[in-house]
UniProtKB/Swiss-Prot annotation:
It comes from Pasteurella multocida (strain Pm70). This is YcgL domain-containing protein PM0444. Residues 1-83 form the YcgL domain. HAMAP family: UPF0745. It comes from the Bacteria. The lineage of its organism: Bacteria, Pseudomonadati, Pseudomonadota, Gammaproteobacteria, Pasteurellales. SUPFAM superfamilies: YcgL-like (SSF160191). InterPro entries: YcgL-like_sf, YcgL_dom. Pfam families: YcgL.
Length: 83
């Protein structure tokens, strides 16, 4: 399963995963407004062997299949956000 990954222009470290590139109709309007204009990062194969850095592939896939998207928030303990 391929998914498209976008980064937020308003919240550093926040990413949105959707099933198809530029398909945001499944994302609630409130979330789209808070996320800001999405910036395309890459297509990612959730069935492949490569791991995601800050998310579990199985959870991403499950969320995309059930609600149409997955929202990755920054880790609270990430030292870069404390600078």
């Amino acid at each position: 399963m391929l998914c498209a990954i976008y980064k937020s222009t308003r919240k550093m470290g926040t990413y949105l995963y959707v099933a198809k590139r530029d398909q945001f109709d499944v994302v609630p309007e409130v979330l789209r407004n808070a996320f800001g204009p999405p910036v395309f990062v890459m297509m990612f194969n959730l069935a492949g062997e490569k791991a995601l850095v800050n998310a579990e592939k199985a959870e991403v896939r499950k969320q995309i299949e059930t609600q149409g998207f997955y929202l990755q928030m920054p880790k609270e303990d990430d030292w870069l956000f404390k600078l």
